[in-house]
């Protein structure tokens, strides 16, 4: 009976250690995924600001060209 109790205790202890290690690895993976998501959102934000600036400059240039064309008439 004592042998059975020790075996069960050992199995439970090893299971808890294994579970603890798995959860720690899971947390590390989630942290890495969050960093990747943050990097991707920063890239998208930078891309959209660049597109916005190019569009703004194009609109200003088009407006100046239109005013110049109206002024010549």
Swiss-Prot record:
This protein's record includes keyword Secreted: yes
Q: Which cysteines are joined by disulfide bonds?
A: none
> Propeptide residue numbers?
23-43, 72-73
Principal localisation: secreted
Signal peptide boundaries = 1-22
Task: Give the residue ranges for region: Disordered.
Answer: 25-46
Which residue stretches does the UniProt record annotate as biased composition, category Acidic residues?
30-40
Query: Which keywords, in A-to-Z order, does the entry hold?
Result: Amidation, Amphibian defense peptide, Antibiotic, Antimicrobial, Cleavage on pair of basic residues, Secreted, Signal
Supply one GO BP term: defense response to bacterium
The Gene Ontology CC terms held by the record are:
extracellular region
- The domain of life for this entry's organism is Eukaryota
Give tissue specificity per the record: Expressed by the skin glands.
Q: According to the UniProt entry, which residues carry Leucine amide?
A: 70
Localization terms from the record: Secreted
One Pfam family linked to the record: FSAP_sig_propep
What family does this belong to?
Answer: Belongs to the frog skin active peptide (FSAP) family. Dermaseptin subfamily.
**Protein role:** Has antiparasitic activity against trypomastigote form of T.cruzi (IC(50)=0.68 uM) in vitro but not against L.infantum. Probably acts by permeabilizing cell membranes. In vitro, shows no cytotoxicity against macrophages. Has antibacterial activity.
- The name this protein carries in UniProt is Dermaseptin-1
Species for this entry: Pithecopus nordestinus
């Amino acid at each position: 009976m004592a042998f059975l109790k020790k075996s069960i205790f050992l199995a439970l202890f090893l299971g808890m250690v294994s579970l603890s290690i798995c959860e720690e690895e899971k947390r590390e993976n989630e942290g890495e995924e969050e960093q990747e998501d943050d990097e991707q959102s920063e890239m998208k934000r930078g891309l959209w600001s660049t597109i916005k600036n190019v569009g703004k400059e194009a609109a200003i240039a088009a407006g100046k060209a239109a005013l110049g064309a109206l002024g010549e008439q």
